[in-house]
Amino acid sequence: MAETKEFKTLYNLFIDSYLQKLAQHSIPTNVTCAIHIGEVIGQFKNCALRITNKCMSNSRLSFTLMVESFIEVISLLPEKDRRAIAEEIGIDLDDVPSAVSKLEKNCNAYAEVNNIIDIQKLDIGECSAPPGQHMLLQIVNTGSAEANCGLQTIVKSLNKIYVPPIIENRLPYYDPWFLVGVAIILVIFTVAICSIRRNLALKYRYGTFLYV
């Protein structure tokens, strides 16, 4: 898989931004993880999985940083698509990132109903790349069941939108005409990743990696 070309989606840009924001805050991230990701399931093809522990004691901050990263990345999309994805996920683009979003409320309820104490299972949907290419899917465990739930929801939406190298190499440049070009290219390639599918029940189990 190391010899193939990497196939990137908006989720890759999102997770890079999220990791940068986590690193910028002088809050201990080496605390013992209260929550571990036990399994990652979904539809996988040519997909490499990486689990990164960035456990924080402040679950609210981790959720806020996640929303900030999401808003920044989807700014590359046309407004109609941007708002449609945000609504699907449960984030109000008119609110400040620190506001408690519908997504966060849903994830709080999810964690409470499922009584997640130690091990959490994530369903990330689809992770597929064309032949001769691979996708690197990074899952960041912040040690919060609520934040991990939010990440699960975001990856399902953003991992469907392919990012051509011309866009990746010029980020973060936000000239209006550039954004128009970005929007057109993104729309053209949105369905590229959705055309290649294969079902796999389990991709990762705590302490074990399976590559497809």
UniProtKB/Swiss-Prot annotation:
Gene: OPG053
Keywords: Disulfide bond, Late protein, Membrane, Transmembrane, Transmembrane helix, Viral envelope protein, Virion
Membrane topology classification: Single-pass membrane protein
Positions of transmembrane segments: 176-196
GO cellular-component term (any): membrane
Protein name (Swiss-Prot/TrEMBL): EFC-associated protein OPG053
Disulfide bond entries: C33-C55, C47-C127, C107-C149
Coiled-coil zones: none
Membrane side Intravirion: residue ranges: 197-212
Protein task: Component of the entry fusion complex (EFC), which consists of 11 proteins. During cell infection, this complex mediates entry of the virion core into the host cytoplasm by a two-step mechanism consisting of lipid mixing of the viral and cellular membranes and subsequent pore formation.
Family according to the record: Belongs to the orthopoxvirus OPG053 family.
Side of membrane Virion surface, spans: 1-175
Membrane is among the record's keywords: yes
PTM remark: Disulfid bonds are oxidized in the cytoplasm by OPG088 protein.
Subunit structure of this chain's protein: Component of the entry fusion complex (EFC) composed of OPG053, OPG076, OPG086, OPG094, OPG095, OPG099, OPG107, OPG143, OPG104, OPG147 and OPG155. Except for OPG095 and OPG052, each of the EFC proteins is required for assembly or stability of the complex.
Record's subcellular location: Virion membrane
